[in-house]
Each structure stands twice: as C-alpha cells, then as structure tokens.
Amino acid sequence: MQTKEFLQQVWPDQGYYCVLGKDQQNVVVPKFINSIDEAIEVVNKLLSDTQDVYFACSTYVEPTERKKINAKEQRILWLDIDCGFDTKKRKWKDYETKDAALVALRSFTDTTQLPAPTIVDSGKGIHCYWPFTEPVDKAIWQPVAEGLKFLCAKHGLKADGACTADMARILRVPGTKNYKDVAKPEDVTVLNQGTSTPFDELARLIPIHLTDKPKAKRPLDEATKAILGNNSSK
C-alpha cells in the first residue's frame, strides 16, 4: 500500500488536508493543502529534509489552524499503541513488543467483531485505522470514537485513550521514517490493508459514549435552605 493509496483511504474528499513536518530540533510546521497529490509533494519534500512526517486525521474548514473547532469531517477511527521500553519513565509502554501488540489487537477484533483494520508499523509502535466508505461530520464521529476508547478499556486492549478520541490528532505517514533515534531511523510501513466499511456498520459494533455534561445547579427551596442553614444574604 503506497502513501497516496493510504491517504486516499483515510482522508475525506472535502475540506483542507494538513501535513506536518518535525525537524531535528522538534520544531513542528503544519502545511495545509487541498489535494492529495499536493500532499504527496509535501511529504516527499519533508522526507528529503530528514524530517518526521505526520498527517492530520481530520479535514479542516479553513487552512488556518489544526484545532477541533476548525475540523470538518472524519473518515477513520484509529488507535495508537506504544511498544517497547520508555527509557525516560523507566517502564514498559503499552506492550513490550510490536508482535505482542498485534496479538492483542487480533484478540480484540475477534472479540468485538470489528473488521481487520489497516495496520501501520510506526517504528516505535502500532497505528490501527478503521476506514469508512463515506466521511462523517465531526459531531457524529466523536461519540463513536469515545465508544471505541471505552471498548478498548472493557476488553483490555492497551492503547492511548487520549489519542483515540482526539479530533485534532496527528499520526505518522506510511512510507516515511521515524527519526526519534536519528542514528537508527525506522521505516513507517503498512503491515495490513484493511477494507473500508460503512460507518453505520462500524457504529453498531461500538457502544456510543456521550461525554457527561455538568448538570445544571438546581435552586434550593426554602425548606432545604432552612435545613442547611443557608442564609441568602451571604
């Protein structure tokens, strides 16, 4: 699966796309474009400059900022599974190895009956994508993404929950390099090409989760005020 084919699978047809490069000083620069062909040109230029290359999962209304309020549509659900040993935190990440993560992912899809996802080896972990046959509005996508996060927790699949439901998330572009260790860059490659599924079919397999909103504060009646010693003059 080539880079262009991957982007065609995961990006909606409408809106602005965003590709980002991160240089060796960790400076991240976003580039908004309005075609996949132009995105490929940007990816190749960043790769030739020895930069880490990312794509924004959403499309955007305006080519201005990569924030939730500016997001337009989604065409994927995703998971970010970290693997290996975190030398800074001195502990193992989600899984010790990528093979262990893939075994856990297979068990998860078997149990939940979710289709086999498109799987990307990010160099240091595993990225999973469930593409839709059609894009959906961000308001429709959000509760299903939250549901996927809770489904992972329910069945014990370790993944970055904050990433799963983050409308403005960026992830690595396949066909590029992971330069976290500049001396030993690792390839970002597609391990499995999943099939696009109608959004409604995926949503039926995922318990919808609506983020709880704070309840409106009810005014106290006079009897309750008296019991609590509530003095309205305070």
Locate the predicted segments by residue.
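Signature for HUH/AEP ssDNA processing cores
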Residues: 1-124, 131-150
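Flexible loop/turn segments at secondary-structure boundaries
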Residues: 126-127, 180
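C-terminal accessory nucleic-acid interaction domains of nucleic acid-metabolism proteins
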Residues: 4-12, 73-74, 153-234
